[in-house]
């Protein structure tokens, strides 16, 4: 029923575009024209579809490969070796877009250097009631309170196993896969939820993410406390180390931007003590920066997009310093240009992710970020991404 509704809305869009206009628009869509997506197609879709319906339609189209193939060719300058793998380019899709592992291959086709799916919870759950996603177009931002809606480990495992051999080849070619793990809303043992995720999906992932920073599951962020985090990660690492050596993924922790200085010091201490493989910095923010213009800015949930950019970059800078640059960081939050990506890399990120930018600019934004990043690396005298990692700390 829901899919028929989405098809009807898409048909309405076809009628609006009209015959000759549709033909030209189809050409621009197929070629991935950046201006057409940013100035015409994406605003039109936003006018026709509510945010969650648009999200579901985007996942559906991506899963079917009905998107322009990336035109930008990755150069050697963009290659990064980190977390035990080669990354063809440092721009990945953040968790939250493909929550259930339905569109992995389409996302690689879009030009991402790595894909992260999830968050995946042990048991299926619906998440919070709708509406739960809100656009702030004036701010190039989104507020969401999805609440870990998930198909569950069993369904996602089935999907990933069906393409396991294909993924092994992609990983070898520099296109790794990450899986973001969450806990069920009603769970009384968070550590066991994450451990179960490691057991089931660990053998199918190149890296796992322990997501303790979503603001939309009650009590989740308290797991970032020093004692709670140490207990949780100790169990997760025990489960990971119990997997067959050939299937032992890296383990990363995803943290919030809304942390005190003491919180950050404690997290850095635990991460170094236990030998965690990396950090993802940051999740969405519950803060509302001054100057937000969107009418829905007061909605409850996590804010992502442009208003998060500087806060996440500063958190990257601090975590890089606190870990002496020895713990790889994936930087996420407000990336929509090569400049945004390079700022995070110079602050200490080895890789970056984006998601909200797709909402406003469409698939061509991936190639745009990579093209601009390469140009800036050359302009600033870097031989490649690797040379720029943490550069601001060496000035």
Curated annotation (Swiss-Prot):
Reactions it catalyzes: (S)-dihydroorotate + a quinone = orotate + a quinol
Segments on the Mitochondrial matrix face: 1-10
Mitochondrion in keyword set: yes
Post-translational events: The uncleaved transit peptide is required for mitochondrial targeting and proper membrane integration.
Primary location recorded for the protein, binned into one broad class: mitochondrion
Subunit field text: Monomer.
Binding site for FMN: 95-99, 119, 180, 211, 254, 282, 305, 334, 355-356
Compartment(s): Mitochondrion inner membrane
Cellular component terms per the entry's GO annotation: cytosol; mitochondrial inner membrane; mitochondrion; nucleoplasm
Disease tied to this protein: Postaxial acrofacial dysostosis: An autosomal recessive syndrome characterized by severe micrognathia, cleft lip and/or palate, hypoplasia or aplasia of the posterior elements of the limbs, coloboma of the eyelids and supernumerary nipples.
Cofactor note: Binds 1 FMN per subunit.
Family of this protein: Belongs to the dihydroorotate dehydrogenase family. Type 2 subfamily.
Cofactor (UniProt): FMN
Miscellaneous notes: The identification of DHODH defects as the cause of postaxial acrofacial dysostosis (POADS) was obtained via exome sequencing, demonstrating that this method is a powerful tool for identifying genes underlying rare Mendelian disorders. Exome sequencing consists of targeted resequencing of all protein-coding subsequences, which requires around 5% as much sequencing as a whole human genome.
GO MF annotation terms: dihydroorotase activity; dihydroorotate dehydrogenase (quinone) activity; dihydroorotate dehydrogenase activity
Keyword Flavoprotein: yes
Record-annotated active site: 214 (nucleophile)
Biological process annotations from GO: 'de novo' pyrimidine nucleobase biosynthetic process; 'de novo' UMP biosynthetic process; pyrimidine ribonucleotide biosynthetic process; UDP biosynthetic process
TM helices/strands, residue ranges: 11-30
Binding, substrate: 99, 144-148, 211-216, 283-284
Topology with respect to the bilayer: Single-pass membrane protein
Function: Catalyzes the conversion of dihydroorotate to orotate with quinone as electron acceptor. Required for UMP biosynthesis via de novo pathway.
Enzyme class name: oxidoreductase
Record's protein name: Dihydroorotate dehydrogenase (quinone), mitochondrial
Extent of the transit peptide: 1-10
